[in-house]
Amino acid sequence: MPASITGLLRPDIAALEPYTPIVPLETLAERLGLPVERIIKLDANENPYGPSPHALAALAAVERDAPHRYAIYPDPDHVRLRAALSRYIGQPPERIICGAGSDELIDLLMRATLRPGDTMIDCPPTFAMYSFDAALYGARVVPVPRTDQFDVDIEGVAEAVEREGAKLLFLAAPNNPTGTPLARSDVERLLDLPIILAIDEAYAEFAGTSVVDMVGACPNLVVLRTFSKWAGLAGLRIGYAAMHEDVAAYVWKIKQPYNVNVAAEVAAIASLDDLEERMATVARIVAERERLAAALAALPGFRVYPSAANFLLCRITGGAARARTICDGLAQRGILIRYFNRPGLDDCIRISVGRPEQNDALLHALRELV
């Protein structure tokens, strides 16, 4: 046995700052001394209404009528799911790749694109997984900060691409954690740059806008989507990406063959078959977003940023200490929201939009705290 096992591991990983995920619900409930059913979870942008009834019925049908499906490997080509997605987004199946959540697709695209020493542009504040994955592959991450209103600095990005020779740019649209939309005209300008532009549309259904129709004509455009938010399937880890078929051929080569499990595929297809119910749920969340935004803006010391997603970012007068105090105070009452201990957001909290009664409980608690 070697004297030091760490000597056989990648030394750069030792210095890598790990990504901080949401603490599991059961762990938080135990830590707070509360039963799980007492917790109001507004910290991870999940769908408060859960999966489609059609999806739940489809899963129950597999368990009842075809349990053997769980004992055999899933379809490595996701033929039925890609056909359903083709009808949903209007792109042919050969432009669609499925994965275990959009997180896997972010990783796959970086694996297909970035070599050690290559450069990726990041536009903070944004989803931290972009810079984390890029660092994992030994890429240089060049930040181009967003404006005070969290818009993308298009000219700054163009200058950075030319100056740094960057290959890849990830942009969430709407952005997480700010909820800021991305104009189609800005996407068109960015597509003129000599980079691969990955648009992460995890919250597109809540925004009502998309650029997925552009992938056929734009070989350097990749659009990522997920079933975690609008479809309420975060626990099953299912997402997909649409891209030009030339790029898809590269990504397909490095995709693990059985990366989407049977349950996830069954639930995703059933959700796509139940679009009327799912879109009605999305509409309810959007309506609640606007009601909640107005109520939060009326609280003393709250600045609420406009959002096109299923969450709201609030800047708190009094700085980081006050924002953290509010977050902790809500947690003691069994209400979980997100505090970001990072530059530019350390005086902010992010609140996922819940059901009306959950939002009312949140507002009642906030009025006590502020």
From Swiss-Prot:
GO terms for molecular function: histidinol-phosphate transaminase activity; pyridoxal phosphate binding. It is an enzyme of class 2 (transferase). Pfam families: Aminotran_1_2 (PF00155). The keyword Amino-acid biosynthesis applies. Pathway: Amino-acid biosynthesis; L-histidine biosynthesis; L-histidine from 5-phospho-alpha-D-ribose 1-diphosphate: step 7/9. Its cofactor is pyridoxal 5'-phosphate. GO terms for biological process: L-histidine biosynthetic process. CDD domains: AAT_like. It catalyses: L-histidinol phosphate + 2-oxoglutarate = 3-(imidazol-4-yl)-2-oxopropyl phosphate + L-glutamate. Coiled coil: none annotated. InterPro entries: Aminotransferase_I/II_large (IPR004839), HisP_aminotrans (IPR005861), PyrdxlP-dep_Trfase (IPR015424), PyrdxlP-dep_Trfase_major (IPR015421), PyrdxlP-dep_Trfase_small (IPR015422). The keyword Amino-acid biosynthesis applies. The modification N6-(pyridoxal phosphate)lysine is found at residue 229. Its EC number is 2.6.1.9. Homodimer. Belongs to the class-II pyridoxal-phosphate-dependent aminotransferase family. Histidinol-phosphate aminotransferase subfamily. This is Histidinol-phosphate aminotransferase. The lineage of its organism: Bacteria, Bacillati, Chloroflexota, Chloroflexia, Chloroflexales. The gene is hisC.
